[in-house]
Amino acid sequence: FSDKEMAMAVEYLEYLGTDQFSANELQLELFKLGLNYDVYAASERVYITLSGLDESIENGIQLFEHIISNVQPNEIALKNTVLDKLKEREDAKLSKRSILYGGLLNYGMYGENSPIKHKFSKEELINLNPDSLVWKIKKLSSYDHYVYYYGRKDIEEIKTLLNKYHQTPENLKPIIPAK
């Protein structure tokens, strides 16, 4: 990913609460609404998906905007996320498939610009600052982005909801290109 910190921040997000809700309370609120969200960092973009019941879309947009705007750092959650990432790397070293397709193939295709080389070192992971990662999350809406809607509601109703709840600056930043 073009921004290593952003990629780590979106992994960390699911373990964070806000100024009003703990991480568990957020999951419970989403469950009550029949909604789920997922955030994933791909090569050049961050994908955010809010899915579930159409009748809960307004509350879901409000809640997700609250999460992004009011997320709070959690040192323990970051330490656990880092430990998970380090364990994942150790496990990958034991997998021939991961070595061949995740490492050698990528290096063969991209050389020095291989995604395998554009990752945090162990020391960098351990020294990540939770406040810096939370700041990245809070700035997600300030980058160029698209909103896609699939559902039964009228598109004008969705536009109205987004205009009402989706807070963005007047001028959006360009997406950071992948290396």
Q: What function would you assign to each model-found segment?
A:
Residues 1-14, 18-70, 82-90, 95-124, ...:
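M16 family metallopeptidases and their MPP-like homologs
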Residues 38-40, 73-80, 172-175:
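Surface-exposed patches in mature extracellular/periplasmic domains of secreted proteins
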Residues 69-70, 74-75, 155-156:
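Short beta-strands and strand-coil junctions in structured, solvent-facing domains, enriched
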Residues 111, 143-179:
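An aromatic/glycine/proline-enriched structural segment found at the starts
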